[in-house]
Design a protein with these regions (language model features):
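Short beta->alpha transition motifs characteristic of CBS
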Residues: 1-11, 54, 67-84, 124, ...
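The conserved cystathionine-beta-synthase
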Residues: 35-54, 60, 81, 104-126, ...
């Protein structure tokens, strides 16, 4: 029996999940995510990330609705707080905090491949991957947490 046939007959098992589950199956849809503008103030970024309870927010191109230009995670926020003295915090904007042009994936990618990209990133570990369409518009976010919860370890 081939791995693909096994996956069809045992979709809930680890091998079945690895061979059948896509990013689309696990991503958080864009409608549930806080959207930020590059000019969003630091206090508003903190408020939106706290309300969202997702640990990240996406920054959209103000001239092209829905097009991703950056991503802000809890880690980006902590680094900005550490690197800037407190009298500068109120003057920071989303564009100062965000990871510009983050690594992205498409919704059709196999979830296990997305997990490998997160684990083996050269610059720093990735806990959140933006999911975009062919036009760079955000479709959702894929969190490492969701991959682990789905049993893709």
């Amino acid at each position: 029996i081939s791995p693909a046939d096994f996956a069809i007959n045992h979709p809930a098992g680890s091998l079945g999940k690895q061979l059948t589950m896509t990013v689309a199956d696990l991503m958080l849809p864009v409608s549930s995510l806080p959207a930020l503008q590059p000019s969003t103030s630091m206090p508003d970024v903190i408020s939106m990330l706290t309300q969202g309870a997702i640990g990240s927010g996406w920054v959209e191109d103000p001239g092209s609705r829905g097009r991703l230009v950056g991503l802000i995670t809890d880690g980006d926020l902590r680094r900005a707080l550490k690197e800037n003295n407190s009298d500068r915090w109120a003057h920071l904007q989303a564009s100062d905090l965000m990871t510009a042009d983050p690594i992205t994936v498409t919704s059709e990618l196999m979830a296990v491949e997305a997990m490998k990209r997160m684990e083996h990133n050269r610059r720093k570990p990735i806990s959140v991957l933006p999911v975009v369409n062919a036009h760079g518009q955000l479709e959702g976010l894929l969190r490492l947490h969701d991959l682990v919860q789905a049993g893709l370890t």
